[in-house]
A protein has these predicted regions:
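Surface/interface-facing alpha-helical segments and adjacent flexible terminal/loop regions used
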Residues: 1-177
């Protein structure tokens, strides 16, 4: 789930690496492997899978100095900086690109990566990632995405992402008990 969502936020929609994912969405096949009951939202994504429109909206929302909704934690959390996130992820052994580590897409991909490592201490790392680096700002960020998006795709992906992050956090809390 995090890998899918992280990829959609991290990569430009026209990126060739996303073609298989957008094909799954367009053909309505993502729902078959989606662990949450979000069929209505997934159906809305399927109906609004126009790459040109999605790309235009992506650029207006997330790209450049004048973007409507900066996709970086440091833009939403007072005193936050990208280097803290980079240091945390590096300490867990995650390979990082030269792109900002506090990008929403990077953080969701990091959650997937940490989950894939599945060592005992990685669930603690996953909790730290959510508690310190995702949850303090993602609801505000996703609310702004929903408010500023002009396409049904991004207006739907924002609450779908919010619900998914909430469900993953709940699952982490249950594992801790």
């Amino acid at each position: 789930m995090c890998r899918v969502l992280g990829s959609l936020y991290y990569r430009q929609p026209q990126d060739p690496l996303l073609v298989p994912l957008f094909t799954l969405i367009r053909e309505g096949k993502l729902a078959a492997n989606w662990p949450l009951e979000q069929d209505d939202m997934l159906a809305r994504l399927q109906k609004s899978c126009d790459i040109t429109q999605i790309s235009t909206d992506y650029n207006a929302l997330f790209v450049g100095e004048e973007c409507a909704v900066p996709p970086y934690r440091s833009a939403w959390v007072d005193g936050a900086n990208e280097s803290d996130v980079r240091a945390f992820l590096s300490s867990r052994g995650m390979p990082l690109a030269d792109t900002p580590a506090d990008h929403i897409g990077t953080l969701l991909l990091a959650a997937s990566w940490l989950e894939d490592q599945s060592a005992e201490d990685e669930s603690e790392a996953l909790e730290t990632l959510f508690a310190d680096y995702l949850l303090p700002w993602c609801n505000t960020f996703l609310g702004k995405v929903e408010a500023h998006a002009v396409t049904p795709f991004w207006r739907t992906l924002a609450p779908l992402t919010r619900d998914a992050i909430g469900a993953m956090w709940d699952e982490l809390q249950e594992e801790e008990e």
